[in-house]
């Protein structure tokens, strides 16, 4: 595989993997999968907002804002290829998760959430896509920190 197209393979591989995994877990949740434990429950919630149900007052208009943000990020990444090459897996994960949640908004009227972490405190209910978005942001930050350290080491 040509080195110049390797990042595209990584991007789309991560995108598809995250999208399929998230939709699969959501389909199990919608089919009635439930589980309770001392720390974590698998349940069902439909989030019509974004994180912590913010912006839920936008109702069905939120899906169009969500769509616009994803389209803008796609365009920016494919225009700014250096950023995409550097963080292809992380952005693939992030956009796969974002598109999966967007699909939920169009099909279900909100995002299907299922994980409820409640040991010591009640945390917001979240889904696989939410976890992948957080992991992708952490990956980008870690890569940037190490890139800066390498650059600083070369300057010394």
UniProtKB/Swiss-Prot annotation:
EC number per UniProt: 3.4.23.36
Gene Ontology MF, one: aspartic-type endopeptidase activity
Chain segments annotated as transmembrane: 5-25, 64-84, 89-109, 122-142
Biological pathway: Protein modification; lipoprotein biosynthesis (signal peptide cleavage)
InterPro entries with a match to the protein in the record: Peptidase_A8 (IPR001872)
Residues at the catalytic site: 113, 130
Alphabetized UniProt keyword annotations: Aspartyl protease, Cell inner membrane, Cell membrane, Hydrolase, Membrane, Protease, Transmembrane, Transmembrane helix
Broad enzyme group: hydrolase
GO cellular component: plasma membrane
Membrane topology label: Multi-pass membrane protein
Superkingdom in the source lineage: Bacteria
UniProt key word Transmembrane helix: yes
Pfam families: Peptidase_A8
GO biological process: proteolysis
Role summary: This protein specifically catalyzes the removal of signal peptides from prolipoproteins.
Name of the protein described by the UniProt record: Lipoprotein signal peptidase
Native species: Campylobacter jejuni subsp. jejuni serotype O:6 (strain 81116 / NCTC 11828)
Lineage of source species: Bacteria, Pseudomonadati, Campylobacterota, Epsilonproteobacteria, Campylobacterales
Gene field: lspA
